[in-house]
Design a protein with these regions (language model features):
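Conserved helix-to-beta-strand junction in the class I
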Residues: 13-14, 85-92, 99, 116
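Mobile active-site "lid"/loop adjacent to the S-adenosyl-L-methionine
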Residues: 39, 51-93, 104
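Class I S-adenosyl-L-methionine
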Residues: 100-143
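Conserved SAM-binding loop of SAM-dependent methyltransferases across substrates and taxa
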Residues: 2-15
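Short, ordered loop/turn segments at secondary-structure junctions
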Residues: 1, 25-26, 41, 61, ...
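S-adenosyl-L-methionine
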Residues: 19, 23-65
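Glycine-centered, small-residue-biased loops immediately flanking beta-strands
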Residues: 18, 94
């Protein structure tokens, strides 16, 4: 999907009542109420996020090699960066949504969400192909 899909949804939902920061390695079309930062998340200076954040949404995934162990390892590396952002900036009571792969990376993320949030949910959007290992895990109400 094109960069900015989640940002469009959140912008429409907030309708000007909040601020949105989007970070993507690819260019993204201008979206109302969205501050866009073009960066590879692995190289991003998290100090630029110098404000409390209510919700972190991540739709990031590594390039797929087709080798499950490598793909899971690469996904976990990205999830660790996302969790670092959650730990540094997400407010108490905040929420976190992240893409992962069913299996190794989802088990890792499940454990990490359970440590940090009161509620954890597994989501598979209707738009996701049935054979796809891609799922989302949602952490609600950060401790």
């Amino acid at each position: 999907s094109a960069p900015g899909g989640w940002s469009q949804v959140v912008s429409k939902e907030l309708n000007g009542t909040g601020s949105i920061i989007a970070i993507d390695i690819l260019d993204m079309p201008k979206i109302k109420d969205v501050k866009f930062i073009k960066s590879d998340l692995r190289e991003f200076d998290q100090n630029k996020l110098n404000q409390p954040i209510d919700v972190v949404i991540s739709d990031i995934a590594p390039n797929i090699s087709g080798v499950r162990f490598i793909d899971d390892t690469n996904m976990i590396d990205l999830l660790e960066i996302e969790l670092s952002i959650v730990d540094k900036t997400l407010v108490k009571g905040g929420n976190f949504l992240a893409k992962c792969f069913e299996g190794g990376s989802s088990e890792f993320l499940r454990k990490e969400i359970n440590k940090r949030f009161k509620i954890m949910k597994r989501l598979k959007p209707d738009s996701s192909r049935k054979i796809s290992k891609e799922i989302y895990l949602l952490g609600l109400n950060k401790n």
